[in-house]
Amino acid sequence: MGMDLALKAKLQKQRYHIVGEHGGVKVCHWTKESLLRDRQCYKGKFYGIASHNCMQTSPVVDQCNLACTYCWREPHMDTLELTDQDPLELLYESVRAQRRLLSGFGGNPKVPREKWLDAQNPKHVAISLNGEPTLYRRLGEYIDLCHKHGMTTMLVTNGTFPKVLERLDPLPTQLYVSVDAPNKEIFDKVCKPKWNSRAWEQFEKTIDLLPSLDTRIVARHTLMKGIN
């Protein structure tokens, strides 16, 4: 089952580059800031990651099992019938897409030529652009390929698929879990599971699992006054 054509056109208008049937790449704001103004995101300060070397991507840019109230992205998931795109194809096509998206910066006098050339070969892959990446059944293979190509990986998940994280091999360089509610009532109100009434219970299992995962872990909060 491929991407909805209306959604695909909308994402492309928003400067997403669609990769395969469900993948996507979009240049991060901080990648642009690094090239144009030598500014870095928090990853630069905390982990020494150069923003111009970071590729923002997702293997399932159009698919998520939640419809969070704060999310500006458009959820478009009704089933779990996803195409398992070849991980090598996904990675190579994502890098090609990143290069195309950065091509215009090469002629900008504000962008140092050496830095722009360096950005053509991403060193860090942020699997966080859109959708829920743990829905991609070959995620472990994809992460493994990134690591074998000398790239670090940062995986952002809503934490509702603990079995995927438990079996994930290898683990990402850094794992981010969205923690947006203290209990089921608020979770259901804020995160709005689309078809899984046990999403909160699954999320709790992920929280219990985290101490056993041998990688850097970050709890990511989106706070809304008076709501969560």
Regions flagged by a language model, labelled:
Residues 108-228:
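Conserved AdoMet/S-adenosylmethionine-binding subsite of the radical SAM
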Residues 1-70, 74-100:
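Flexible, acidic/Gly-rich N-terminal and inter-domain linker regions that tether
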Residues 89-119:
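Short Fe-S-cluster ligation motifs
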